[in-house]
Amino acid sequence: MIFDALKSKAASLKSDSRVRKLVLACRKLLSEKGEASGASLARETLAFYAELDSDQRVRFFKILALDFSPDPARVLASATAYAQKPSAENLAVLTHVAEPPRQELLRRFNRAPGGTQAIVSMRERLLDALRKDAQLSQVDADFRHLLSSWFNPGFLRLVRVDWNAPAALLEKLIKHEAVHEIRGWNDLHRRLEQDRRCFAFFHPVMPEEPLIFVEVALVKDMAAEIGPLLDVDAAPANPRDCNTAVFYSISNCQPGLRGISLGNFLIKQVVDQLMQEFPRLKRFCTLSPVPGFRDWLKEKAARGFEPQYRIPSEVFAALAQVEAKLGDTLGAGVAELRLQEKRISALRDELLCLVSAYLTGVGEPDGLSGDPVARFHLHNGAKLDRLNWGADAFDKGLRQSLGLMVNYVYEPRRIEYNHEQFVRGVTVASKDVTGRLS
């Protein structure tokens, strides 16, 4: 037991020494004046960081939060000076002292070869730690501030990925596909055929790493179910005969860039590119999952709506029917859901009413849907256009939304208006959706 205690103590001291070594290197890096020596020191500092385990990384992030923040006394003095004399010089001083030193530390990390990728990976670990320690949010704010500038869409390159792309890149598409799993090379090949398009954003300093990619199907009408779009045996259509582009999957490849606005710019640039390549395209829409619907439905069936919100009587009636006839199935696994298909189908109208309520934010404090996919597209300026019953028969679709999917429509001339409405708390939706709530 004594030996075990000594081993534990030694491991703890070694762990502390690694963090201390990294912090000392960070302080030295911040004080370094030379560019060449600074790049070398940045590389060495990032190498120290790479040696840390998960617990040590958390300790390092906490030190960044506590010891690499602005000096409150200097900030107050500079703010007072600026308030008394609001000159450009005093403003510059205030701006300088108010910036957390860790921001400059991150800039200096970026001098090292591969520094940008290292910072993106570092933020991925920070986001993991942030789930358990809200104090780290101030550190994340600095990461997010810098990454938002470094990954500004003006710096990004839009690339069409086709079957002739390097195998390593194609493997990354398979690995990072987040919406509809790519089931091998044949599946990927079909998604890159002549009537399909895949576009990705790349950053100049990470040329081998896709940041985000979107998959598009060129078809002759707005798609109502995902199965035909993913059918590997379906014959490719002539894209020149198609009038509709369906965005059916968008996937982030870099978890460390979560919350950095990339997807909205990607879709808009792809729309522009497709319009140039295929002038006959008249409609740009999505076929989107509703990932939060089943959880929302279970929660409302168990607890109901908050009394302070006005809920349409149709929604109350639909919820009562679903709770009475399907309550025991709402929490069931996929196998049981398939067995109960007839019971679920008998409540089609009620479930469509409820998904309309969910997607338009009925009963939500801000009047907007809590569904992440809905918020993304609606904030991006799309219109909530059509609900599709039985659109996703795959396990994931049944588990998340009882097979329901949605079409969001991007009308280039209406995008800004729709976005402004969403920001004001209004969801722009078709009568197919709103008509179910009255």
Regions found by a protein language model. Give the residues of each.
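Extended, composition-driven regions rather than compact fold-specific motifs
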Residues: M1-I260, N264-S438
